[in-house]
Regions:
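All-alpha prenyltransferase/terpene-synthase fold signal
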Residues: 1-325
Length: 325
């Protein structure tokens, strides 16, 4: 099924307007800055988060100039965070292409990330909405908090779902959460509608991250990324956390602690992956996605009246679960 076409259908023109405004925001006359920004623009992406903002605005009213400036601000903040993340993670790839730090260097990456972040703040200032500016500021702080929390979690001997959810809510889900609620705010939604949109976004973001985490337990040829990559980076995700907690296997718990200290080898990771699959870790993670899928569908059933928007948001939700990368 062509989920993306269904998602874009009711916001096709608005999405084109967004892309134009976003690209204009990432233009500059300075030679070096211009080259870096052009590299970032060329990476493109599916625009999943801006589409969520536009759909929410259209659901509760119209996509206005306020919506567009807010959506651009959100995407710019997200882009800046990715540029900085690649420096922190020492990553040389982003969406299959060379990262900014790989193509240029860390100094350029940090400075360009700062420039994009400042541009995000400028964009949302054009909304003249104190609430939208506040939400975007809250988002930036929460994303940073999530990154620091994940770093500090390496030294935390506790392995728990609670710690896992705290990190993914701050690192991933909050972005979907704010895209949804800011879209609603831009359309003049009521407090009750904004709260519902925010919860929908958080549930959607959690589903997105759990699906991403499940990819790590399959071969690269199946999902497009190497098996056990998260564990190589010291991350324990929901499937293995469940398998460890449900069995209490001491040998595997010892391996899990080695993962957190990044002292594990590929053979040990393969053992943990096999252990997770054998003890229902994948199935449990899928059950958790299903629970949040049901909550998202309740929002769509109760809060979305327009058939085209209902179809688009349902396709969005289905795409997040069905995607292979």
């Amino acid at each position: 099924m062509d989920y993306l076409s269904l998602i874009k259908s009711p916001i096709h023109e608005e999405l084109n307007d967004f892309v134009t405004l976003f690209n204009r925001s990432l233009s500059h006359d300075n030679g070096l800055l211009s080259r870096v920004l052009e590299h970032i623009r060329q990476r493109g992406g599916k625009r999943m988060r801006p589409m969520l903002t536009l759909l929410m605005a259209k659901n509760f009213g119209i996509v206005s100039e306020v919506t567009q400036y807010a959506a651009v601000g959100l995407e710019l903040l997200h882009t800046a965070s990715l540029v900085h993340d690649d420096v922190v993670d020492e990553s040389n790839k982003r969406r299959g292409q060379a990262s900014v730090n790989a193509l240029f260097d860390n100094k350029v990456s940090v400075l360009v990330g700062d420039y994009i972040l400042s541009t995000a703040l400028l964009s949302v200032s054009y909304t003249n909405s104190e609430l939208i500016v506040r939400y975007l500021s809250e988002l930036g702080r929460t994303l940073s908090d999530g990154e620091i929390l994940q770093l500090s979690n390496i030294d935390n001997t506790e392995i728990s779902e609670e710690a896992y959810y705290e990190i993914i809510k701050k690192k991933t889900a909050v972005l979907f959460e704010m895209c949804a609620v800011i879209g609603a705010v831009s359309a003049g939604a009521s407090d009750e509608e904004m709260a519902a949109a925010r919860q929908f976004g958080q549930d959607l973001g959690i589903i997105f991250q759990i699906r991403d985490d499940i990819f790590d337990y399959y071969e690269e040829t199946e999902v497009g990324k190497p098996t056990g990559n998260d564990m190589l980076e010291g991350k324990l995700t929901l499937p293995v956390i469940y398998a460890l907690q449900s069995t209490g296997d001491e040998a595997m718990l010892a391996l899990a602690h080695k993962v957190k200290q990044q002292e594990v080898n590929t053979a040990e990771i393969a053992s943990l992956v096999a252990f997770t699959k054998a003890h229902g870790g994948i199935e449990y993670a899928e059950q958790q996605m299903a629970k949040r899928h049901a909550a998202c569908m309740q929002f769509i059933d109760e809060r979305v009246g327009d058939v085209a928007i209902k179809t688009a948001l349902t396709a969005y939700l289905d795409y997040v679960i069905a995607r292979k990368s």
